[in-house]
Amino acid sequence: MFDFSNFTHRWGKSEDYKVFVNGQEIPVYTCRVSAYPFNRLWPGYQRSIDQTECASYVNLVSDEELEIRVEPLSKSVDGNIMIKPYSKGIKVKKEGGQIVFSIKDHGGYVLEIDDYHGFLYIFNNHPMVCEDPQKVTHYFGKGVHFPGKLILKSNDSVYVDKDALVYGCIFAENAENIRIYGNGVFDDSGEARFCEPCYEKYTNGNIKLYDCKNIQIDGVGFTNSAVWCVNLFHCFGVEINAINIFGQWRYNTDGIDIVNSCNITVRHSFVHSFDDAITVKGIDRYSYESNRNMLFEHCVLWCDWGKTCEIGLETAAPEYENIIFRDCDILRAGNTACDIQNGDCAEVHDVIFENLRVELESFYTPSVVQRSESQIYDRKDEIEIAKVLSVRNKRYREKHAFLGFTHEAESKIPIGDKRFAGVHDIQVKDIYVYCDETIAQQYGTKCVILDVNNFIPTTEYRDIIVSGIFLNGKKLAALDMDVRTEGVAPDALAIQ
């Protein structure tokens, strides 16, 4: 069987595509995305709409292989057709002005013609059925709903039908045993951000949880967040599976932010963020709590601006330990795919980046920080080469003094201890980088960048091991890559 979201009002029907699935035309909706990677520190008001553009999407539910026919209405079918992730190996035919292909795996896909502008999201979801609506605390059936800020309590559940469009956001504090599931969409466009802090309750984003445990989030789509999209502050035992984060464009819209938490898994999810995609942070309020035991796997990640798989920049915690990013496709890495920014006091160790596939495209333009009202994005003719790995420990509080920090976070690790902002026992292995012909000609194998910097003389970096880096299928040696080190012992970084 297959089905699809059919919202009951005229919500952004696409003028760029017609889509047919197994011979049936289905509705194609639109969402807003960033037009180019141009971000800034919160200026007191939201990002201008003229820095954005529309993308299209279809939201499918299926348990069978699907034949998909896409008819482009604003671009030529004769252009360069890309179906991502490339690792899926989807073969494309062109028939009668249509792009024809099949998909059988659940997950998020992206169709691009020539570049990323005017792309099409294709979400193929596993069916999630609510057998008894009477047993669900908050049931959103077919239709459009306006709950505003949905405040959950312990043992609450939320179900979102595939035909439900919910204008609102989710909040919980000191709660446990919560389940949020379904194939519909939460849209946070009704929320206005009015202040700087991302850590506080003032602005919610799609989901914000404080001091919660035993949480399940399955299958739901989240769009148009006012700030960080999915927020977990000091949470324990959280399972996130097969969610879709998309249509994000506002300032600081990170995808998933996990703060001083433990026992977290994120699987089979699609995360397209404007800012960082997945990041693990530590902040003063919870600086006594380490970040431990986290697994991010089988995900499709797309970061417009910032970092993709990130530790930091805020690392106010005793330790980061046993954190794994594994078997993920990175459609766009922002400026860095695998990132450790130990900007505070934590000892970061036993972190693994494994079996990641990083796509570099010559139409990805450089990330720029907007510093004034008059500044425009003027780097549309340049190429951004995202770093495969970056490890550094520049001081967060020095870089962001405007936040008013006056001291280092409380921690068992004092300044001057070799563990303070230290990094050790890091594995980066089996990283498969794809680059297009333009990048290959201009940069060669030097498009693969490893950057390891220690800015604190009393701090130790050691046992950072990189093994199995491939470019377009060819394994690279250390001399093939652009390897940059500063302030680290010669044996701190080993490339195998």
Language-model features, listed with the residues they occupy:
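Aromatic- and glycine-enriched pocket-lining scaffold segments that form the walls
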Residues: 5, 18-22, 28, 219-220, ...
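An acidic-aromatic substrate-binding cleft motif
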Residues: 126-150
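Right-handed parallel beta-helix
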Residues: 155-157, 162, 176-187, 213-224, ...
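Short glycine/acidic-rich loop motifs that flank beta-strands on beta-rich extracellular proteins
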Residues: 147-150, 167-171, 189-194, 226-232, ...
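Beta-strand-enriched, solvent-exposed domains that form extended recognition/catalytic surfaces
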Residues: 2-134
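Extracellular beta-rich repeat passengers
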Residues: 336-496
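Short tyrosine-centred short linear motifs in exposed loops/low-complexity segments
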Residues: 64, 105-109, 213, 226, ...
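Extracellular beta-strand-rich solenoid/capping regions of secreted or surface-exposed proteins
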Residues: 99-103, 145-157, 165-181, 189-215, ...
